Amino acid sequence: MSKPEEVVNHVPEDEGSDIEAGGLFEDPPDFYPPSPPPTTEHYTMKNGDDITLHLVGHSPLEAHTLWNGAVIISQYFEEHPEEVKDRTVLEIGAAAGLPSLVAAVLGAKKVVVTDFPDPDIVDVMWKNIRGCPMLAVDREEDRNIVADGYVWGGKEAPLLAHLGEQKEGEAGFDVLILADLLFRHSEHSKLVDTIQFTLKKKPGSKAFVVFTSYRPWLQHKDLAFFDLARERGFIVDKFLEVKTEKPLFENDPGDEEIRKTVTGWTVRWPTDDEKAAAKADA
């Protein structure tokens, strides 16, 4: 079949992105029909605990969808709790924030769950945190998870402030989560910027990047993110591939097998040995 470049039903092409600080276009109040009402999803953990996820009714930033990448990386953390237990975690583009909630339940030291600083989206993230019975606390300051607004590529200081004082040379998060963000091709550079700004420069620190190519004809553009990360000096490794029973958006065009496939990758700083090897090969 031909490979159209136009917008498909659910995942827009965004090469003229307006995701800038304060950069959502404003339209007259009656320009669009009323937004759909908020929705609710449920995620059942392996021990039977239920996490209720509230989502906004509609968002131009796709925050109204529980994406497959969020579910798959949450399941991965349950199978490998050592990846998040006693570690600091930052999720960007989180929407409902499922992976962050799971990381917090699994004993992360501190989780900062973020999305675009739209009040409705941030309120929903807080609602999901406060509504999770496994994360109940007597005092807000005792929580190991907080929600905040963040624009990709923006200043890291407000995010790092949630971690309190850190040792010199150890600023940053142990774990970053990027779930189903790569379809926004024009934002790849800012996503890599965020990894550079916020990932702790320490062995074992890594960004988990999990995604599906929802537009199979643009898969090469999704994967270009990893080329950019390598150009910036990061080491990229594939760690996961899962085939879902059906595509998230069943009626969308494109190869169904690709639309059912979720892959996971880690992006990390090189070790001293890897730096030396790269220098020797140059």
Swiss-Prot record:
PROSITE patterns per record: SAM_MT_NNT1 (PS51560)
Region named Disordered: 1-32
InterPro entries, per database record: EFM7, Methyltransf_16, SAM-dependent_MTases_sf
A Gene Ontology cellular-component term: cytoplasm
Binding positions (S-adenosyl-L-methionine): 67, 93-95, 115, 152, 179
Catalytic activity, EC: 2.1.1.-
GO molecular function (one): protein methyltransferase activity
Enzyme class of the recorded protein, top EC level: transferase
SUPFAM superfamilies: S-adenosyl-L-methionine-dependent methyltransferases (SSF53335)
Biased composition (Basic and acidic residues): 1-13
GO biological process, one term: methylation
Subcellular location(s) per record: Cytoplasm
Keywords: Cytoplasm, Methyltransferase, S-adenosyl-L-methionine, Transferase
Presence of keyword Protein biosynthesis: no
Assigned protein family: Belongs to the class I-like SAM-binding methyltransferase superfamily. EFM7 family.
Function of the protein: S-adenosyl-L-methionine-dependent protein methyltransferase that trimethylates the N-terminal glycine 'Gly-2' of elongation factor 1-alpha, before also catalyzing the mono- and dimethylation of 'Lys-3'.
This protein's name: Protein N-terminal and lysine N-methyltransferase efm7
Organism: Neurospora crassa (strain ATCC 24698 / 74-OR23-1A / CBS 708.71 / DSM 1257 / FGSC 987)
Gene of this entry: nnt-1
